[in-house]
Amino acid sequence: MSGGLFYNPFLRPNKGLLKKPDKEYLRLIPKCFQTPGAAGVVDVRGPQTPLCFYQDSLTVVGGDEDGKGMWWRQRAQEGTARPEADTHGSPLDFHVYDILETVYTHEKCAVIPSDKQGYVVPCGIVIKLLGRRKADGASVCVNVFGQQAYFYASAPQGLDVEFAVLSALKASTFDRRTPCRVSVEKVTRRSIMGYGNHAGDYHKITLSHPNSVCHVATWLQDKHGCRIFEANVDATRRFVLDNDFVTFGWYSCRRAIPRLQHRDSYAELEYDCEVGDLSVRREDSSWPSYQALAFDIECLGEEGFPTATNEADLILQISCVLWSTGEEAGRYRRILLTLGTCEDIEGVEVYEFPSELDMLYAFFQLIRDLSVEIVTGYNVANFDWPYILDRARHIYSINPASLGKIRAGGVCEVRRPHDAGKGFLRANTKVRITGLIPIDMYAVCRDKLSLSDYKLDTVARHLLGAKKEDVHYKEIPRLFAAGPEGRRRLGMYCVQDSALVMDLLNHFVIHVEVAEIAKIAHIPCRRVLDDGQQIRVFSCLLAAAQKENFILPMPSASDRDGYQGATVIQPLSGFYNSPVLVVDFASLYPSIIQAHNLCYSTMITPGEEHRLAGLRPGEDYESFRLTGGVYHFVKKHVHESFLASLLTSWLAKRKAIKKLLAACEDPRQRTILDKQQLAIKCTCNAVYGFTGVANGLFPCLSIAETVTLQGRTMLERAKAFVEALSPANLQALAPSPDAWAPLNPEGQLRVIYGDTDSLFIECRGFSESETLRFAEALAAHTTRSLFVAPISLEAEKTFSCLMLITKKRYVGVLTDGKTLMKGVELVRKTACKFVQTRCRRVLDLVLADARVKEAASLLSHRPFQESFTQGLPVGFLPVIDILNQAYTDLREGRVPMGELCFSTELSRKLSAYKSTQMPHLAVYQKFVERNEELPQIHDRIQYVFVEPKGGVKGARKTEMAEDPAYAERHGVPVAVDHYFDKLLQGAANILQCLFDNNSGAALSVLQNFTARPPF
């Protein structure tokens, strides 16, 4: 739209066009709308409802009480708005993507069907199923009545449990506000904790308000000494597990009553039903067309990097790229929401707003009225979402939850981690928005990729081969204030980012992976990425136990004692110029749980030995000496482990899925099957960690310690067995006498490292081809000789040469020619490019050149002091040549200034630093002295190190730091020796395994043999 067609009604009121509601709005309007190029904002207050300009027309953003805002009206004009609902109960087929727990009180009786009213007097749980109708893809909300929240208690003899529960409720201020219906009944259950528990009487305590569960359970435990079970299971999980439902999939409802008035949601259709009306269609794994949104924001930073609580730091633009999961990747609808006028952008719908407030209302309503289910972006959990929500709440007093998919009781928040210190594991910012599946592709990329950095540009280049056009945040104010053309350029950049993120979503197909994990773990999709793996295993264990009438106790303090974790076979550091075979235990920890039948329900703890009566040691149970004494676990024929049973069924299902995958030709179905098997793999690997997290949902550190103990024992047994094998033993493993050529009779196997679930075996005297020949047979022979199913060793990879530095740190060349690095940074990421490239040349030479490899092997097998007395092997001299050439390049000024630059972020104002004795701050102060443009907060300040004035030795880094542009412009010589020392330190860290695994020794050798010319 051209600038002349847009007018700002809040700067030039045209009151005749506006309907005045009772509400008054605050608007912050950029001054550049009145005076091009001006900074700052104008504060305007008035009753005008939010407005938008689109295609030369002025429209009202906000909708009426039915949620019919600008996006809904647009759909109505296109003929894609809300379909008609039946006026009577009829069957309904629909797909569910989210399940919510809400509470109705008796006040709702007037608006719900009469046969449902008994469920909500005085209050009751109503489960909301959000999804799409099968018939036409319309968004639906199904309100399900009849689900209960409950827990179990084992009470002392003589306690009147019902009276105790009522007493607890009377003591609660919550219950006085909302009366709660109570039911207490005796049931027969068994505790899962410990072998030999017999079925007994427990009290099942049902409460009509879920918030009462925790209070009542704590009261019974603390006041009356009751043992509490499953008080940490919410009504949503009860709904899924009690009825064998799914969290993502197709449902059928035999009698769905449409709700035409007094609706709870903004879905296109809303229905009421009871739990008993529902059934699941598991055989159908297809998806309806769900709506995915990728968004990005551009902000104005008046004083540097934008701060949400600074009124003038407006959100200038929001790009929204929409994609339907039923469409091909790339078929996107591109939308730009912008403040002020903006020239047209090809392929983009541009909506112009007079103020930020109007644009925020439009953004929230876009998510609601376009029925968005999946929201993604890049680092949106840490920046975009907090920024939008902070602006909405703190600047404009908007409640974003009220604009969501649920009319009341919705959540729209960002939960930031409060502590990143000791014991804080995998702390992530969590986005919780009712009715949305939030997926931050930044977190996904960090989890699935191994890159030097995870900027969107880097990831897009690596995965998509796409180049991201970047605009520095310091350019944003200038572009925005420049007028419609500047905003067009800014908008193109903004939309491009969102489109790239949507491409990444489709590349990883992460939405399908999330859905498959949700199904197998019995949890809603929105909890998959943010809530970790504990909740997944807990839900599965709960489901398995429930089928056998077992119940899970609440964890106690005694369950949280520490234990010794996994250990490794210490590495024999050095350079190995012979093949190194790596054998892995396939799914080590899950296979140990299966092989030894480990579980809460098969364990007999110290002091409970009477439970072993009638059982035979070794035949009926195994014993393990742990930190707290001797623990026993009964074998499968006595009682099958729930954990092992889960693993067995999952792995069998995964095997069946992989078989289907191999025969499947439909691309979409192949994607679903692949994500299903991956979801099973992830969940299997989480079982051990579930038992070993002291502050987890159901910890049992005795099980975790038993697993790690067995893992250590298995590594040690395998090491001894492998090292005892002779070439003749290996020859005998050939599938037939003539299948293999004779192996080298002088060959020898030696385990040089063992890491949790793998062994590194040096195959000294064997060729690469010989090692590859016997690798699989060796692994299979070791498995047959030492272990029971399903424990299995597999030949994973073979290195042709290997630099083994310390545990979990090595670099080597695989037999296919690829270089593999584990735990190794060639140099620190903060090192300059000069040091990085030269260190890479050194490493490549050591791993690729035959003479250098021989020399490196010799060096690693002798004391480093011999290098001073006997000199370096001739084959190692090319490494020294690289370092000497680097020094010459520095001295003669052949290294570009850009390769010598370092950079550090200016994280706060200069006055806020406790010490300014840092190189980047020294350069900042030089900018001040020279009256040059100053960097803003969050800018990275570049610097190089130059020779100190007068050639003073031992000068501090702050005295040597200089602006690269200034140094190049004025011919200031760089600090040659400083950079060369950095290079030697980087090379020494790489080569330390050649010199007694001592980086200091390696540095002294390199310093001794590099020919640093005299001054």
From Swiss-Prot:
PANTHER family on file: DNA POLYMERASE CATALYTIC SUBUNIT, DNA POLYMERASE DELTA CATALYTIC SUBUNIT
Subunit (UniProt): Forms a complex with the major DNA-binding protein BALF2, the DNA polymerase processivity factor BMRF1, and the alkaline exonuclease BGLF5. Interacts with the putative helicase-primase complex composed of BBLF4, BSLF1 and BBLF2/3 proteins; these interactions may coordinate leading and lagging strand DNA synthesis at the replication fork.
Protein task: Replicates viral genomic DNA in the late phase of lytic infection, producing long concatemeric DNA. The replication complex is composed of six viral proteins: the DNA polymerase, processivity factor, primase, primase-associated factor, helicase, and ssDNA-binding protein.
Enzyme type, top EC level: transferase
Q: What organism, scientifically named, is this protein from?
A: Epstein-Barr virus (strain GD1) (HHV-4)
Q: Which InterPro entries match?
A: DNA-dir_DNA_pol_B, DNA-dir_DNA_pol_B_CS, DNA-dir_DNA_pol_B_exonuc, DNA-dir_DNA_pol_B_multi_dom, DNA/RNA_pol_sf, DNA_pol_B_thumb, DNA_pol_palm_dom_sf, DNA_pol_type-B
- Protein name, UniProt field: DNA polymerase catalytic subunit
Where does it live in the cell?
Host nucleus
- SUPFAM superfamilies (UniProt xref): DNA/RNA polymerases (SSF56672), Ribonuclease H-like (SSF53098)
Under Gene Ontology molecular function, one entry of this record is: DNA-directed DNA polymerase activity
User: What is an annotated GO biological process for this record, any one?
Assistant: nucleotide-excision repair, DNA gap filling
E.C. numbers: 2.7.7.7
Which Pfam families does the UniProt entry name for this protein? DNA_pol_B, DNA_pol_B_exo1
Family (UniProt): Belongs to the DNA polymerase type-B family.
Taxon lineage: Viruses, Duplodnaviria, Heunggongvirae, Peploviricota, Herviviricetes
